[in-house]
A protein has these predicted regions:
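Generic alpha-helical secondary structure signal
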Residues: 107-110, 211-214, 270-274
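Residues that form generic nucleotide/phosphate-binding pockets
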Residues: 112-116, 215-220, 279
């Protein structure tokens, strides 16, 4: 790497296909500029329809809408499901057509981030959690006081390192589990150097780390004395809808090797997040 470090990942650096297809060559101005499905799928579908160039139109889909293409393709449902999981980004919710900045739910976030876990063996996405993740589980039988999200409460960085993991991501909502949700934030743990891990907290509004997450971060210092903790103080978000997108973008930048210090030096806009929705979710 040269002396100038990247501060952000550009939209053009993020594949519109499943991220494990990052090596796929895209030729602008051709059908392949929006193609994620393999040629063999197009050949199979085109046997009973018009030529490739008119395939989307003949099936009643807009050009490049490969989820729509599979909906109407003469293929077995199990094959369609497999193709979606292997090649395509998660499907863009229909409600976004009328409300393009609709709040992300936990499933939207989980579906996107789990694809990165599939694409990058050294990365694990631990999950999407409420702020009371460490509270006793109210649904536990016999009144046992067990952590609501045990996988997070029991997270051991050294164990993860020995499993081959070098980055761990997670997203939190600042509401407890019994409420409807208020604001998404993210945590990323860099364990490339297990002797000096870096745990960084990101809030798109730049607010202080909530006490429960701060306590979790301090717990990693108890595991590894030289663990470094950090948070962003810069405000990125100025609207009220894109906190989930900002949280995912932060983790994606960390996965791409952007340093936390560089990432926090300047912000990206809410409009950038709206454009990113069109990349991370497809039709």
């Amino acid at each position: 790497m040269g002396s100038t470090q990247k501060r952000k990942v550009a939209l053009t650096d993020i594949s519109r296909c499943h991220p494990k297809m990052k090596g796929k060559k895209i030729v602008k101005g051709t059908r392949k500029s929006h193609q994620c499905l393999p040629d063999s799928v197009y050949h199979e579908i085109s046997k009973s329809h018009l030529s490739k160039n008119g395939l989307f139109q003949s099936l009643g889909c807009n050009e490049g809408e490969e989820h729509c293409l599979l909906d109407k393709a003469p293929l077995d449902d199990s094959i369609k499901k497999s193709l979606r999981r292997q090649y395509l980004r998660p499907r863009r919710p229909k409600g976004w057509d009328a409300d393009p900045d609709m709040w992300l739910d936990n499933y939207n976030i989980m579906h996107v981030m789990k694809q990165y876990e599939e694409a990058i063996p050294s990365f694990t996405f631990l999950g999407v959690f409420p702020i009371d993740f460490s509270a006793p589980n109210p649904y536990q039988p016999d009144g046992e006081k067990k952590c609501l999200h045990k996988e997070l409460c029991d997270l051991n960085l050294i164990n993860e390192y020995h499993k081959g993991k070098r980055g761990i991501g997670m997203v939190f909502n600042l509401d407890p589990h019994y409420k409807g949700g208020s604001h998404w934030v993210a945590l990323y743990i860099n364990i490339v150097n297990i002797n000096k891990p870096f745990v960084c907290y990101f809030d798109s509004y730049g607010y202080d780390t909530p006490p429960l997450i701060a306590r979790l971060m301090r717990s990693f210092k108890l595991q590894i004395k030289n663990c470094h903790l950090g948070r962003n103080a810069r405000r990125f978000q100025y609207g009220n809808s894109e906190c989930g997108m900002f949280s995912m973008y932060f983790i994606i930048c960390m996965i791409h090797g952007i340093s936390f210090k560089q990432f926090c030096k300047d912000s990206v806009s809410d409009d950038f997040m709206l454009q990113l929705r069109k990349v991370l979710f497809s039709k």
